[in-house]
Amino acid sequence: MKSDSIAVDVPAESSSVIKGKAPLLGLARDHTGSGGYKRGLSIFDFLLRLAAIVAALAAAATMGTSDETLPFFTQFLQFEASYDDLPTFQFFVVAIAIVAGYLVLSLPFSVVTIVRPLAVAPRLLLLVLDTAALALDTAAASAAAAIVYLAHNGNTNTNWLPICQQFGDFCQKTSGAVVSAFASVTFLAILVVISGVSLKRP
């Protein structure tokens, strides 16, 4: 009877140990894989923020320096085109500068997500603020794009004449600024997607 009790107790103890250890090993393996995956996304996030900063600063600087004066003038008139002649372009410069400033300030939080890829709070904060920056950036770029279109093509229904034949440099700079702004919009949209994917549970 003693040998029978020993034969029955030993397998029971070994099976309980196996059942207790197996899930822990599986969880540890999944945890490590998820951390490496999210760290890779965080590094990509940081690089995209640098690209978005460059695009936003280029857009704001180009629009802010768009100024052209025609070489001919009359006794009472001087023909000049500048971004501050149009409130839409003024809004563009201010809004894109705000977006660029936010992106610079967001870099430390992006670094935190690289060091601690499983941290939820900084990633959630970046998701909310990136969405707000994306909305502001899109509004500024879209409004400026409408004015640039009118500058190139005019509007015959309202007798608005195109001015780009006379102010070629001005139109070239404003068009380049709008293109750079939409590039930053694209980068921000990708950042929002990355933040959403990073918050997804493994």
From Swiss-Prot:
List, alphabetically, the PANTHER family matched: CASP-LIKE PROTEIN, CASP-LIKE PROTEIN 1U1
Protein name (database record):
Casparian strip membrane protein 4
What is the predominant subcellular site recorded for this chain?
membrane
Subunit details: Homodimer and heterodimers with other CASP proteins. Interacts with CASP1, CASP2, CASP3 and CASP5.
Q: Can you supply one Gene Ontology CC term for this chain's record?
A: Casparian strip
What topology does it adopt in the membrane? Multi-pass membrane protein
GO MF term set: protein homodimerization activity
Gene symbol?
Answer: CASP4
- Which keywords are on file for this protein? Cell membrane, Cell wall biogenesis/degradation, Membrane, Transmembrane, Transmembrane helix
Coiled-coil intervals, chain numbering: none
Q: Can you tell which superkingdom this protein's organism belongs to?
A: Eukaryota
Family assignment? Belongs to the Casparian strip membrane proteins (CASP) family.
Where is it localised? Cell membrane
Which residue ranges does the entry give as Extracellular-facing topology?
Answer: 62-90, 152-176
Q: Which organism is it from?
A: Arabidopsis thaliana
Residue ranges, Cytoplasmic side: 1-40, 112-130, 198-202
This molecule's function is given as: Regulates membrane-cell wall junctions and localized cell wall deposition. Required for establishment of the Casparian strip membrane domain (CSD) and the subsequent formation of Casparian strips, a cell wall modification of the root endodermis that determines an apoplastic barrier between the intraorganismal apoplasm and the extraorganismal apoplasm and prevents lateral diffusion.
For this protein, the record's NCBIfam families field holds: A_tha_TIGR01569 (TIGR01569)
Membrane spanning residue stretches = 41-61, 91-111, 131-151, 177-197
The family database entries (InterPro entries) matched by this protein are listed as: CASP/CASPL (IPR006459), CASP_dom (IPR006702), CASPL (IPR044173)
